[in-house]
A protein has these predicted regions:
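An acidic-aromatic substrate-binding cleft motif
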Residues: 1-11
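Intrinsically disordered, low-complexity acidic segments that are enriched in bulky aromatics
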Residues: 100-103, 108-110, 186, 195-197, ...
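Glycan-recognition surfaces
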Residues: 121-131, 144-145, 151, 191-277
Length: 277
């Protein structure tokens, strides 16, 4: 179990806020199994705002089209250090550090034809520009018929491993079911040299619908979430749990994305408390 920045902070969490919540969790909740701090979506967007997404946002990317922490929100990431300083501080509290990531490759990298690390391919050659997320314009999907697509995920996960990331939450991947994306992440995790937990999350217009997930999900190497944030609609979430039982097994189970208490800065109720459990 752990804490996820989406609840309370939405898209605009800062390093100071992450550390404050991590310190509280280490002091009061770690003895009860709360051991993972996850920085959710838009950590790579300098201009992220509470309350929604910015279409066509300019992102913080490295020369290979991989997301970097926005230094105005995560000052310790300056000078190319990425999330390693923050991860080190989280680890120093006895906790694990996790990141949210959207499937695919940034549209900005495609626009600028940035190279894919270790290959002769460029982002515009490996992108599937017909594959888009319905609610976030940051990324295109990847064309997994091109070897550079797997190479991009491999390089992304190597970078995360070098920062000391322990957990990834891959979003917009189960609704619809992107089997190739899940398999590509699995290979990238195996090749990264890191020790990971992972979660593949539903993202679609009807998050409360029961999912029928195929057996290959067992190779995801972690958890599959049934839907979006639970809020106060627990009974509406139960069908998703039952649907996922056939795909559970050793090292792979069913969980919730978030179980929220209080309000959220991404909505009208203001910032209170939240949790990923």
């Amino acid at each position: 179990m752990g804490w996820n920045s989406w609840d309370c902070y939405g898209t605009s969490v800062t390093e100071e806020e992450v550390l404050a919540n991590a310190a509280f969790m280490a002091r009061h909740l770690l003895p009860f199994g709360w051991d993972t701090v996850v920085v959710d979506i838009q950590w790579y967007e300098p201009g992220a705002r509470a309350g929604g997404y910015n279409d066509g946002a300019e992102l913080e990317l490295d020369p290979y089209g991989r997301q970097l922490p926005a230094p105005n929100r995560f000052p310790s990431a300056a000078s190319g250090l990425g999330f390693k300083p923050l991860a080190d501080r989280i680890h120093g509290l006895g906790l694990k550090f996790g990141l949210h990531i959207m499937r695919g490759i940034p549209r900005q990298a495609v626009r600028d034809a940035l190279p894919v690390e270790g290959t002769d391919a460029t982002a515009d050659q490996v992108a599937d520009t017909s594959s888009v997320c319905e609610w976030n314009t940051d990324n295109f999907g990847l064309d997994h018929g091109h070897p550079g697509a797997q190479a991009y995920y491999d390089s992304q996960l190597r970078l995360f491993a070098s920062w000391g990331v322990d957990f990834i939450k891959a979003d917009d991947i189960l609704g619809p079911y992107f089997a190739e994306e899940i398999a590509a992440y699995r290979r990238a995790i195996d090749r990264s040299g890191g020790t990971w937990s992972s979660a593949c999350r539903l993202a679609g217009p009807c998050p409360w619908h029961t999912l029928s997930i195929c057996a290959p999900m067992l190779t995801c190497g972690g958890f599959r979430t049934t839907s979006g944030t639970a809020g106060r609609m627990w009974r509406r979430s139960l069908p998703g749990w039952h649907a996922g039982l056939p795909t559970s097994g050793p090292g792979a189970g069913r969980t919730r994305t978030c179980c929220r208490w209080g309000g959220s800065r991404c909505g009208p109720s203001g910032g209170l408390h939240g949790s990923r459990a």
